[in-house]
UniProtKB/Swiss-Prot annotation:
Disruption phenotype: No visible phenotype. This is Mediator of RNA polymerase II transcription subunit 33B. It comes from the Eukaryota. Component of the Mediator complex, a coactivator involved in the regulated transcription of nearly all RNA polymerase II-dependent genes. Mediator functions as a bridge to convey information from gene-specific regulatory proteins to the basal RNA polymerase II transcription machinery. The Mediator complex, having a compact conformation in its free form, is recruited to promoters by direct interactions with regulatory proteins and serves for the assembly of a functional preinitiation complex with RNA polymerase II and the general transcription factors. Belongs to the Mediator complex subunit 33 family. One of its GO terms (biological process) is regulation of phenylpropanoid metabolic process. The gene is MED33B. GO terms for cellular component: mediator complex; membrane. Residues 772-792 are annotated as: Disordered.
């Protein structure tokens, strides 16, 4: 059927010309020119797709002859048919019939060689779109490769890729190798569909010339493939195809971004560029707040972000991670080589922690080094290797274990290189011999090797490291650090006895409590006893699990935590009915578990492992059950201690309160121009996080691979939990929120709550009221509550704990009012509060929230801390002030001075005075620690929120009580300055920048800059003469949580970054040198890769890295989002009035600093891929920022910054995004990518524009293909 464009008469003329040429054997060129004139006179647009289809259809196979091929080739040469369309028409006809017609196959490849590499004429031709659509209709490329947009550039890419693929399959088929491929057959037609007996007979009767031609054809096909791979245009097109084509038969190649030398940032592997890891480690060691997020997950994302941004190998990334973890331990004056032996050999008892107080101890620091860090590494390796799970899930041999990716090899190399840091791993000479024997025993135990002669003298600790790592790698636990195996020598026999079935005698139990388990099997054995053993055995297991295995069993710590959380939620019996909770029957067992996990270090360890939401979900049912019943039943523990439901409830409830900032003063919510950044932790929030994690876990290949590490004997319920399931807890929380937000509602006389309040007041002030009755009138407006000294209220107070908590705010209000009016003395008030807290320790939470809210409301007159009515700070207040000044000396921050009569006139708000007076009545021991750690952070934040010098006064009172805590308390007090003074925060940030960059050294340490200058010797390092000056980074880590409005930090950090860049340029680039670098031979304005700029660029990257870390640590995801959406666009729009200093180098360096700052901040918050939960927010914010960028480039937005800064920022940002975070580009709107690429081309950034399009996926693949052709044509 004739093409529609041709009239019948014209069609007949063309047919006649073809037949005449074949019959008369005319010159093909003469025939082609004559045909061109005929078509032109008929008004046919050339080249003509319809003519190409007609010619190919006419020739194959009825008129197939050598002359026909010559006519076709000349038709292409004189441009009357599109070359690529002819090739597309020939491919499905010739290649499948190559064995029947080897000559045709040869001629087809000759046409490929001549015309398959010329794309520019096609792209510029007016019929480009029509031609490519015709090719798609013929070869069905859109359907084959999933090209949805059907852009001509995308079809062109698919066509080139299909040609190479067809040639490759044909060559493999000729050599009999096609069956060895994964699909066993070609994706394309490789044999004729109309093969008949004649064809087979002809195939059998091939002569030697025929065979030789086939062999020559195979050789030519391979040469053509090689040419496609070497040609400048087609090689880039093929690379683009392999990067974006979604097909199981196309292996995705690694992405290598092509970035112009004028726009690529100078990336270095300087160790200082890993500084964010050190800051992160210090930040997670702050124990004042339990984090709902997992430190392991956050560290995983951080390391991946830095590895991508620094363009380093995984070996360098993991080595930097290990060294940062080691520095964390050493900054706390804990020598790692001592710490292991401290718990093993008990010979270094003289070693002491650097600072005493309610702060993380040795075990927590080692948890970061030996548990959190290895788990983060395991996550990274599992992400890489999880891609093989689905492919080998049906394999009985678990072949995935044999596939080692780059991450795993990088880990092994980094561990091997740690041997260069022998000083960190070598024990003191005094214990060298014992240490070597310990190392040998550890190797023998882990490896299962026995030594017949018992001699270990020739084994060293370094060998222990190597042996342990090899063994643990083979088991794929990935939890072995260089010296982890050493602690396993401690009383290994006690765990061996358990595994052999020995009963848990008291002596064996004590040994197991103090000796960490060495394997998951041992913990599973304990779990089995806890679920099936007797009551005494269950209690023994609870003590064992909360002992050394939890605190120092770093290789199995994550498993112990999960087992404990699971045991806190025992399943209900099948025959349970009614409202009675089955948890009551497990009271002694649960109490031991709850007490065991209450220490500061333990809660911190749970937080580091991200188990806080799961723990909250386990604690809420316990609180609901034990708080709802009357305490008529008591239980006796094996220690002889008598407990009631109130005791179990108080322990569980105070532990639950510590999991979020329940004491957060309302002041932090109502002051400032903006609300607090990020979600405010609450019971609902913790349950939401728990439900989401459990619902999502196990659905991704990475999670399924991670589950291989976990125990199979436990099955955690994934059913969602909501607050509605706990009505009494929900009622208390609603009252708690009301108490924090407003004054108490009126209490009705004669109500049940009124009677409970009366009974509690009678109990609290029984001694004070022996002389008669006393009226305590609360300020809330409730009726007068009378207490009588003669009433015995003990029977009346056998009430559910929730009922007592409901009445507690009214009790406190009445007591505080009575004290304010003089009806109660301060000492009597403190004594009464202590009686209430002893009766039900859970009321401490109510005291904290009530007193905090009352201080915030400011309705109470201050009281004089004169030593008569209230305790006096006079003994050491001046000393405390001096030491605060000493701590802040390096920052240049001014400390408010007390007036001359300040000591004698020291006052505190009445609620704060009552709370601090209560706390100093406690005796510090293990029994009260779990309750004081609830009050301590609240007291600290409450005092910090009050005017100066409330915090020094509180600190003075506590240092008088606990002198060994003085360093901790004074350091905490120094943070108050930053809570009240925004300028002090800015000065501290400035100190962080100048000290890290070594710009204005205030000490020999600061002159070198880097991590050591920023973080110094850690928190509270002590020398002779008391606590030392705090390094600015450590101080900022400790104070940023108390900054009321963190939104201003983005602008200040940005300003400090710009100032630092100017200082760097002034110091590193003299004006004369800068002028010489203004023009480089490649035509770009600035030469980033020049040697003269390398040092400056390293410092600029370090400054940007510091700034990004501070933004992320200070405000998390929301603050980074504000930086990208608001702060940066506002900065570029604003006029800064800067001069073109140093030949324009300062503006350029500022642009690159901003680019790295923006990319790194975003990578910290969102992650570099989609595995990070926060990555769901990334596309919207990134689109807004790129839309702003494109609009400014198109002239729709006027900029106020230096043009060189803007140009450097745009090219730098795009370069880093394409090279380091290519996954981001795939999430951006295709049209924005195309517009941005077009603007970059206008700046002569052709390669960068191309790299951006190449990273844009299928949506920009067509535009990238066309740009490849145009760019190569220009060159």
């Amino acid at each position: 059927m004739a093409p529609s464009e041709f009239q019948p008469s014209l069609w007949e003329s063309v047919t006649s010309l073809i037949r005449s040429a074949q019959e008369k054997n005319v010159d093909p060129l003469h025939w082609a020119l004559q045909l061109r004139l005929t078509l032109a006179s008929a008004g046919i647009s050339l080249p003509s797709p319809d003519l190409a289809q007609f010619l190919v259809t006419h020739i194959f196979w009825e008129n197939h002859s050598p002359l026909s091929w010559k006519l076709l080739e000349k038709a292409i040469s004189v441009n009357i048919v599109p070359p690529l369309l002819v090739l597309a028409l020939l491919s499905p006809r010739v290649i499948p019939n190559r064995k029947l017609h080897p000559a045709a196959y040869r001629l087809y490849m000759e046409l490929l060689k001549r015309h398959a590499f010329s794309f520019m004429p096609l792209i510029r031709a007016p019929g480009y779109h029509k031609t490519m659509n015709s090719i798609d209709d013929i070869l069905h490329l859109s359907e084959t490769f999933g090209v949805q947009d059907q852009e001509p550039g995308s079809i062109l890419l698919a066509f080139v890729f299909s040609i190479v693929w067809e040639l490759l399959d044909a060559s493999l088929d000729e050599e009999g190798l096609l069956e060895l491929t994964s699909n066993k057959r070609s994706k394309w037609p490789s044999s004729p569909h109309d093969m008949d007996l004649d064809g087979l007979e002809n195939s059998v009767k091939r002569n030697e010339n025929h065979d030789a031609l086939e062999k020559a054809n195979t050789e030519m096909a391979i040469e053509l493939i090689q040419e496609f791979l070497q040609n400048k245009v087609t090689s880039r097109i093929l690379h683009l195809a392999s990067q974006n084509m979604e097909s199981k038969t196309i292996p995705r190649g690694e992405f290598h971004a092509i970035v112009s030398s004028g726009s690529k940032l100078a990336l270095t592997s300087d160790s200082a560029l890993w500084l964010p890891i050190d800051l992160f480690f210090e930040d997670i060691m702050d124990g004042t707040q339990a984090a709902a997020a997992s430190a392991v997950e956050n560290l995983t994302g951080l390391v991946k972000a830095l590895q991508a941004a620094n363009s380093t190998s995984w070996h360098d990334a993991f080595l930097a991670l290990w060294l940062a973890a080691l520095r964390l331990v050493q900054r706390e004056n804990l020598c790692l080589r001592y710490c292991f032996f401290m718990h093993m050999l008990e010979i270094l008892s003289e070693e002491r922690d650097p600072i005493e107080g309610p702060v993380p101890r040795t075990d927590t620091f080692l948890c970061v080094l030996l548990s959190v860090t290895p788990l983060a590494v395991a996550n990274i390796i599992e992400e890489e290797e999880s891609q093989w799970i689905d492919q080998t899930s049906s394999s009985p041999s678990n072949q995935w274990k044999e596939k080692k990716g780059k991450c795993r090899q990088g880990l092994i190399n980094s561990l091997q290189q740690l041997g260069d840091y022998e000083s960190l791993l070598t024990p003191p000479r005094s214990v060298q011999s014992v240490a070597n024997q310990a190392a040998a025993k550890a190797i023998m135990f882990i490896s299962g090797i026995t030594n017949s002669n018992g001699s270990y003298e020739n084994t060293s600790m370094s060998e222990s490291a190597s042996g342990c790592c090899k063994v643990r790698f083979s088991l794929f636990t990935l939890k072995m650090f260089v010296v982890m195996g050493v602690y396993l020598l401690c009383n290994i026999s006690c765990w061996s006895l358990v595994m052999k079935g020995s009963p848990l005698t008291p002596s064996l139990t004590n040994s197991l409590i103090t000796t960490p388990a060495s394997s998951l099997a041992e913990i599973e054995k304990m779990y089995e006893v806890a679920t099936t053993g007797s009551e005494d055995e269950k209690i023994a297991v609870a003590s064992i699990l909360c002992g050394a295995s939890l605190f120092r069993g770093w290789s199995i710590q994550e498993h112990v935590i999960i087992f404990i959380v699971t045991l806190l939620s025992p399943p209900a019996p099948a025959d349970l009915s009614g409202s009675y909770s089955h948890l009551i029957n497990s009271a002694p067992f649960l109490n031991v578990l709850l007490v065991g996990i209450s220490p500061i270090d333990c809660v911190h360890i749970f937080s580091l492992h991200g188990v806080v939401p799961l723990l909250a979900g386990a604690l809420m049912p316990i609180c609901e059950a034990f708080g709802s019943g009357v305490p008529n039943i008591t239980w006796t523990l094996p220690t002889g201690e008598l407990i009631s439901s109130h005791a179990v409830f108080s322990t569980a409830f105070t532990l639950l309160l510590r999991l979020w900032r329940f004491d957060h003063p309302p002041l932090d919510y109502v002051l400032g121009d903006v609300p607090p950044v990020g979600p405010q932790p609450s019971p609902e929030y913790l349950l939401l996080v728990r439900n989401c994690r459990l619902e999502c876990f196990g659905k991704s290949p990475k999670d399924r691979m991670a589950r291989r590490r976990f125990s199979k004997v436990i099955d955690i319920s994934v059913d969602p939990i909501f607050m509605d399931s706990f009505p009494r807890l929900k009622q208390w929380y609603r009252q708690h929120q009301e108490c924090m937000a407003s004054i108490l509602s009126e209490l009705k006389t004669g109500s049940p709550v009124h009677h409970i309040v009366d009974s509690l007041l009678s109990m609290m002030f029984k001694k004070a009221n022996k002389g008669g009755s006393q009226s305590l009138t609360p300020s809330s407006g409730s009726s007068s509550l009378s207490t009588s000294g003669g009433d015995d209220s003990s029977d009346q107070l056998k009430l559910p704990a929730w009922d007592i908590l409901e009445a507690a705010p009214f009790v406190l209000d009445a007591a505080l009012t009575a004290c304010a009016h003089g009806s109660l003395s301060p000492r009597e008030l403190a004594t009464g509060l202590k009686i209430l807290a002893d009766f039900l320790p859970a009321t401490l939470g109510t005291m904290v929230s009530y007193f905090s809210s009352e201080v915030t409301r400011g309705l109470w007159k201050p009281v004089s801390m004169n030593g008569t009515d209230w305790p006096s700070p006079a003994a050491n207040l001046a000393s405390v002030e001096q030491q605060i000044e000493k701590i802040l000396a390096a920052t240049g921050v001014d400390v408010p001075r007390l007036p001359a009569d300040g000591i004698s006139a020291a006052t505190l708000p009445l609620p704060l005075a009552a709370l601090v007076s209560l706390t100093i009545t406690y005796k510090l021991d293990k029994a009260t620690e779990r309750f004081l750690v609830l009050v301590g952070p609240a007291l600290d934040s409450l005092a910090a929120a009050c005017p100066w010098p409330c915090m020094p006064i509180v600190t003075s009172l506590w240092t008088q009580k606990v002198k060994r805590w003085s360093d901790f308390l004074i350091f905490s007090a120094s943070r108050t300055v930053f809570h009240h003074n925004r300028d002090a925060v800015i000065q501290l940030l400035r100190s962080c920048f100048t000290c890290t960059l070594g710009l204005t050294p205030t000490s020999q340490l600061c002159s070198y800059g880097g991590v050591g200058a920023l973080l110094g010797h850690g928190f509270g390092s002590r020398y002779s003469g008391g606590i030392s000056t705090a390094a600015p980074g450590i101080l900022y880590i400790k104070v940023h949580r108390s900054i009321r409005d963190v939104m201003f930090l983005t602008e200040e950090i940005l300003s400090l970054l710009m100032f630092s860049v100017k200082s760097i340029a002034t110091r590193e680039l003299p004006a004369g040198q800068a002028e010489k670098l203004k023009k480089t031979k490649d035509g770009s304005r600035y030469g980033i890769g020049q040697v003269s700029l390398s040092l400056a660029m390293r410092r600029v990257k370090l400054a940007a890295s510091l700034g990004a870390s501070l933004v992320w640590i200070s405000g998390g995801l929301n603050l980074v989002q504000a930086l990208i959406k608001e702060t940066l666009p506002s900065w570029f729009i604003s006029v800064h009035g800067e001069e073109d200093e140093l030949g324009g180098m300062v503006p350029m360096l500022r642009g690159y600093a901003l680019a790295y700052f923006a990319i790194l901040s975003s990578a910290f918050a969102w992650g570099v891929d989609s595995s990070y939960p926060a990555s769901k927010r990334r596309p919207r914010v990134l689109w807004l920022h790129l839309e702003f960028m494109v609009s400014a480039l198109e002239g729709k937005i006027s900029l106020g910054c230096d043009w060189a800064t803007w140009q450097a920022y745009v090219t730098g940002f795009v370069s880093l995004m394409v090279q380091c975070t290519p996954a981001w580009v795939l999430e951006v709107d295709v049209e924005v990518i195309k517009r941005l690429s077009k603007s970059l081309r206008q700046w002569n950034e052709q390669d960068l524009a191309l790299a951006l399009l190449c990273a844009g996926g299928l949506g920009t693949m067509g535009a990238a293909t066309e740009l490849i052709v145009e760019t190569c044509h220009q060159h």
